[in-house]
């Protein structure tokens, strides 16, 4: 029996293609909040305590968002990275330096964010300002990032796995 059901993505547009939406990423639970993203849809924060949508903003992402330090960080399908306030939904910063680079999910490594791209680069981004701090080359197009015990696990589209450690 479902405890809670809510629509987290609403389609818009005139044609069937424009109205196509898809929830490809896994939801992120942070305290009493659940954060979801959708392709050609929205980034949505649901408050489990009230069982209501706290806020929703138009966004297109196929990646799992990162939720940390009161921020929701989304890597959009166009390559823009946006940080929102977890409670208000207000945009804190945006980074447009990686447009059209088919970004991976953002992750927190140490005190900074990391995203991967189609050219096999890992980009380090300041969590508070969105400024790009540096980059490193991997073995191929980055698909998924995961951080466990301060180590960055990088998987590529061609099946390679590399493990990086924060300095």
Where are these regions (language model features)?
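Residue-level signal for well-ordered, solvent-exposed loop/turn and beta-edge residues enriched
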Residues: 1, 51-52, 90, 121, ...
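Extracytoplasmic beta-rich repeat domains
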Residues: 3-28, 52-69, 92-109, 135-149
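Short coil/turn segments within WD40 beta-propeller repeats
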Residues: 41, 79-80, 119-121, 159
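WD40 beta-propeller blade core
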Residues: 44, 82-83, 123, 162
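Short loop/turn segments that connect beta-strands within beta-propeller blades
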Residues: 47-51, 85-89, 126-130, 166-167
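Blade-level signature of beta-propeller repeat domains, shared across WD40, Kelch, NHL, RCC1
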Residues: 132, 138-167
């Amino acid at each position: 029996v479902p405890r809670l059901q809510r629509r987290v993505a609403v389609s818009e547009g005139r044609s069937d293609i424009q109205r196509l939406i898809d929830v490809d990423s896994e939801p992120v639970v942070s305290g009493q909040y659940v954060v979801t993203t959708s392709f050609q849809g929205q980034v949505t924060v649901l408050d489990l305590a009230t069982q209501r949508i706290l806020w929703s903003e138009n966004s297109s992402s196929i990646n799992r968002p990162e939720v940390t330090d009161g921020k929701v960080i989304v890597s959009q399908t166009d390559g823009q990275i946006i940080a929102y306030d977890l409670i208000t939904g207000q945009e804190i910063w945006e980074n447009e330096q990686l447009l059209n680079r088919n970004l991976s999910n953002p992750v927190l490594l140490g005190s900074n964010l990391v995203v991967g791209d189609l050219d096999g680069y890992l980009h380090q981004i300041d969590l508070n300002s969105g400024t790009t701090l540096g980059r490193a080359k991997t073995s191929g197009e980055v698909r998924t990032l995961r951080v466990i015990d301060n180590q960055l696990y990088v998987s590529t589209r061609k099946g390679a796995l590399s493990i990086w450690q924060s300095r």
